[in-house]
Regions:
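Short active-site oxyanion
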Residues: 9-10, 64-67, 86-88
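A short beta-strand-loop structural module common to alpha/beta enzyme folds
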Residues: 36-47
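Short, structured active-site "lid" loops
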Residues: 52-73
Length: 126
């Protein structure tokens, strides 16, 4: 049986549509749990292109790290991230899909939708 790898760092990034959810996750989850994380932007709700932030996050992911990507629907960042050879990004909508993709696909990047902004069940997916 393959043992789960130790995660030493979490990278998080979003476009403008995911900025509010990203800020919430950082403040209410990553910060409170004292996770070792790096915020790769964006830093406002000013319009930006999600592929740029997905690419930046993917370049940082290695065997001891994981990523969280957020855009309006989660679909765009998922497609962008999966263009990178070493990335297995999964769009998740609830705790069950997050758990199953981690277990069965060894996903190293979770993709979330920022619109509409919903706090419910977010932490169960992380």
């Amino acid at each position: 049986m393959k043992l789960p790898r130790k995660i030493e760092k979490i990278y998080i990034a979003s476009d403008h549509a995911g900025f509010r959810l990203k800020s919430f996750i950082i403040k209410e989850y990553l910060g409170k749990k004292k996770c070792n994380f790096v915020d790769l932007g964006t830093n406002s709700d000013k319009s930006v292109d999600y592929p740029k932030f997905a690419k930046t996050l993917c370049k940082n992911i290695n065997k001891s790290s994981m990523g969280i990507l957020i855009c309006g629907s989660g679909i765009g960042v998922s497609i962008s991230a999966n263009r990178h050879k070493h990335i297995r990004a999964s769009l998740c909508h609830n705790a069950q899909t997050a758990k199953m993709t981690r277990k069965h696909n060894d996903s190293n990047v979770i993709c979330l939708k920022g619109r509409p902004f919903v706090k419910k069940n977010i932490f169960a997916m992380l």
